[in-house]
From Swiss-Prot:
Reaction equations catalysed: L-tyrosyl-[protein] + ATP = O-phospho-L-tyrosyl-[protein] + ADP + H(+)
Domain PH, residue spans: 3-132
Name of this chain's protein: Tyrosine-protein kinase BTK
Organism: Gallus gallus
Amino acids binding 1D-myo-inositol 1,3,4,5-tetrakisphosphate: 26, 28, 39, 53
Modified positions (Phosphotyrosine) in chain numbering: 40, 220, 342, 359, 373, 549
Length: 657
């Protein structure tokens, strides 16, 4: 699938291709790629794309411009009056699309209405960029709508009639006033473009004492979100100018442009297996087998890290079998000679792993099948960035569009929405009096720099109005607790263990940053549309003002997830998070049961202090229960670290070859 440049929800006017066609307006999800402008139905309840309703080939577009607004439009297409933009809490769906623009192509104008002027500008700019080399660009356009069989601006009755107004700025590569030429060749660059291309590159910074400047390759495309960002093109190389422990690095591209990039979008060129479709970094043997069987294709294969042999790789291959209807799977360790050559079959040596894979894609050479079809856990979608652009932590509420309410949490209502009409976000609307706001705002910048693939990313805050908003990554499948209770299927033990592993990876990261969660539980973990579990609300319990929540004697205090030292002395540490993780594992394996379900909070406190521990859930093996139980040692110092717990969880997975 082509890379998506822009994605937004707009109001689309019907094109009335037939004289009898009705004039109507419908909300559609628009996607822009290098080759097509497409629009789809949109499921506002689930936040998902529906069926495709139409598309326009980019090469057929002749003009993109604004349209003069209608006279006396209905409320949904009226520009909000001053002050209305800030009444955000009352909006649960996109209600207004007052900013029209037109995309003109061989079948006439396509009229689109944007919810904000800024979003309209962005789309017009990007559309003009992708059509700039089109051969049929026009230099006159119709500034007003086509209605009732004619253009309101000039009364011409032919839909494809020449425009009546000269474009103020040149359209694409042509200049205003220049005769129209039908040629498929791109026009030569203008003097301004020539100057830009020929501008000499700035000198490379001097190498550091440690050696040469770091070079990286982009794993994903990245479209800049602000002026300080640098665009990334998947597969392109970049030079790192400033590297830090923070999630944004300053980089330079091959054309000399400089800016900030998300560090989790690139990898060192010397370690670039991640750019290959066949490589899955964090996947276990049992997960690989499950995926290969689901795909069921002869020669399906996965290259993955070996969990039992650090630094080694394993190739898992599927082949059909007359004996077993589910097929058979073999796992081959990628071996390395003393001369650093790789092989699966000793007679065939290669200098790199990609060369080895390429060879076996054409030759089985001792394998049960040649490597025909790369299989992955999911399409490698781009990860979340730490903030919506470099240095952007204060978000303008006018850039937010509210789509639906997700629920109510400790701090107030949570809604699903879009940032600048394009990026899915969750918006926590903080109820006044529920949070120590000033203290949280001071800490928000620090929390934004916590970035890990198994943490729900904090994008930013809106603090210049009340209520304040916390903007985070959107997780389509909601909280883990409800996911466990409501999913209408039986979870396999490997799936439950993977959920625990996801959480443990996030907690190991927080542990390494000396950051405490303080309220780890299934209700505070979320599940995305790919079934990956991420830890949410880390550290937020410090800012709760409700005594019923902050006091260990309060009715809302998480007694059932708390160790004795917290219940007795309110003593929090990484080891109190470890205790909570053990209870979370119990929740997962009991499919969302309430811990200590037969006792109230005060009884639970008494029993925990006296040494009572949760029983082994039916779905948990003895080895899994041993990990849970190790988290509940009375002495905090005797509990394992999250790093040790992660190692134990990995060890439980099927033995590696």
């Amino acid at each position: 699938m082509a890379s998506i440049i822009l994605e937004s929800i707009f109001l689309k006017r019907s094109q009335q291709k037939k004289k009898t066609s009705p004039l109507n307006f419908k909300k559609r999800l628009f996607l822009l790629t290098e080759s097509k402008l497409s629009y789809y139905e949109y499921d506002f309840e689930r936040g998902r794309r529906g069926s495709k309703k139409g598309s326009v080939d980019i090469e057929k577009i002749t003009c993109v411009e604004t349209v003069v607004p209608e006279n006396n439009p209905p409320p949904e297409r009226q520009v909000p009056k001053k002050g209305e933009d800030y009444n955000m809490e009352q909006i649960s769906i996109i209600e207004r699309f007052p900013y029209p623009f037109q995309v003109v192509y061989d079948e006439g104008p396509l009229y689109v209405f944007s919810p904000t002027e800024e979003l309209r500008k962005r789309w017009i700019h990007q559309l003009k960029s992708v059509i700039r080399y089109n051969s049929d660009l026009v230099q006159k356009y119709h500034p007003c709508f086509w209605i009732d069989g004619q253009y309101l601006c000039c009364s011409q009755t032919a839909k494809n009639a020449m425009g009546c107004k000269i474009l103020e700025s040149r359209n694409g590569s042509l200049k205003a006033g220049r005769s129209h030429r039908k040629t498929k060749k791109p026009l030569p660059p203008t003097p301004e473009e020539d100057t830009m291309v020929m501008k000499p590159l700035p000198p490379e910074p001097a190498p550091s004492a440690a050696g040469e400047m770091k070079k990286v390759v982009a794993l994903y495309n990245y479209v800049p979100m602000n002026v300080q960002d640098l665009q990334l093109q998947k597969g392109e190389d970049y030079l790192i100018l400033e590297e830090s422990h923070l999630p944004w690095w300053k980089a330079r591209d091959k054309n000399g442009r400089e800016g900030y990039i998300p560090s989790n979008y690139v990898t060192a060129t010397s370690n670039s297996l991640e750019i290959y479709e066949w490589y899955s970094k964090n996947i276990t043997r049992s997960q690989a087998e499950q995926l290969l069987k689901q795909e069921g294709k002869e020669g399906g294969f996965i290259v993955r890290d070996s969990t039992s042999k650090t630094g080694k790789y394993t190739v898992s291959v599927y082949a059909k079998s007359a004996v077993d209807p589910q097929g058979m799977i073999r796992h081959y360790v990628v071996c390395c000679t003393p001369q650093n050559q790789y092989y699966l079959a000793e007679k065939h040596l290669f200098n790199t792993i990609p060369e080895l894979i390429t060879y076996h894609q054409h030759n089985s050479a001792g394998l049960i099948s040649r490597l025909k079809y790369p299989v992955s856990r999911h399409q490698k979608s781009a990860p979340s960035t730490a903030g919506l652009g470099y240095g952007s932590w204060e978000i303008d509420p006018k850039d937010l569009t509210f789509l639906k309410e997700l629920g109510t949490g400790q701090f107030g209502v949570v809604k699903y929405g879009k940032w600048r009409g394009q990026y899915n976000v969750a918006i926590k609307m903080i109820r006044e009096g529920s949070m120590s706001e000033d203290e949280f705002i001071d800490e928000a910048k620090v929390m934004m720099n916590l970035s890990h693939e198994k943490l729900v990313q904090l994008y930013g805050v809106c603090t210049k109005q009340r209520p304040i908003f916390i903007i985070t990554e959107y997780m389509a499948n909601g909280c883990l607790l409800n996911f466990l209770r409501e999913t209408q299927r039986r979870f396999q033990p490997a799936e439950l263990l993977e959920m625990c592993k996801d959480v443990c990876e996030a907690m190991e990261y927080l542990e390494s940053k000396q950051f405490l969660h303080r309220d780890l539980a299934a209700r505070n973990c979320l599940v995305n549309d790919q079934g990956i579990v991420k830890v949410s609300d880390f550290g937020l319990s410090r800012y709760v003002l409700d005594d019923e929540y902050t006091s260990s004697m309060g009715s809302k205090f998480p007694v059932r997830w708390s160790p004795p030292e917290v219940l007795l002395y309110s003593k929090f540490s990484s080891k109190s998070d470890v205790w909570s993780f053990g209870v979370l594992m119990w929740e997962v394996y009991s499919l969302g049961k309430m811990p200590y379900e037969r006792f109230n909070n005060s009884e639970t406190t008494e029993h925990v202090i006296q040494g009572l521990r949760l029983y082994r859930p039916q779905q948990a093996s003895e080895r899994v229960y041993a990990i849970m139980y190790s988290c509940w040692h009375e002495k905090a110092e005797e509990r394992p670290t999250f790093s040790a717990l992660l190692g134990s969880i990995v060890d439980i997975t099927d033995e590696e070859p």
